[in-house]
Regions:
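Core segments of cupin and vicinal oxygen chelate
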Residues: 30-69
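Vicinal oxygen chelate
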Residues: 1-19, 25-34, 62, 79-105, 108-146
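Long, hydrophobic N-terminal alpha-helical segment
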Residues: 14, 18-33, 38
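Short beta-strand/turn micro-motifs at beta-sheet edges
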Residues: 15-18, 75-79
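Short, charged/polar, Gly/Pro-enriched secondary-structure boundary elements
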Residues: 66-70, 77, 136
Length: 146
């Protein structure tokens, strides 16, 4: 992947390519929730994610070969202000699934507060934003073919 930062790596004082950690990918990300068991049910029921297992504090989930963890945080605070989507988690769907996904959200009375199909230069496609049961911002996206 190309370095898209404005500062070339060679210009960062004290950092050379040999100093970089060579990661292979992302194993999982973590989403803070008030009740990880209830949240696991939401993600399984609404987004068809697979529940792997739960402990006293965590629920481990899988979606399309990627993993995420729902962490019980009793005093969870939404990282976004109302109506904002800067901090969010995007779930990809196929083209024929996008409209069906929108209908599922509507049928479940889950409000989509933002929709766009134009103007996204990095990930062009159809994007819809909504909240999980804890107010975390989620996105469903169909990426246009390149």
């Amino acid at each position: 992947m190309e370095n898209t930062m404005n500062v070339p790596i060679r210009d960062v004082p004290g950092v050379t390519p040999k100093d970089q950690i060579r990661t292979k990918g992302i194993l999982h990300f973590t989403i803070g929730v008030r009740d990880h068991i209830a949240a696991a049910k939401f993600y399984a029921d609404v987004l068809s994610c697979n529940h792997i297992r739960s402990s006293d504090r965590y629920s481990f989930m899988e979606c399309g070969g990627s993993f995420f963890v729902l962490a019980k945080i009793p005093h969870h605070v939404n990282p976004n202000n109302p109506g904002e989507d800067a901090h969010h988690h995007a779930f990809m769907v196929d083209e024929d699934e996008f409209d069906r996904a929108m209908a599922v959200l509507k049928a479940r009375n889950i409000e989509t507060f933002k929709y766009t199909s134009e103007g996204h230069h990095t990930f062009p496609g159809r994007h819809a934003y909504f909240h999980d049961s804890d107010g975390n911002c989620l996105e469903i996206v169909y990426l246009y073919p390149k």
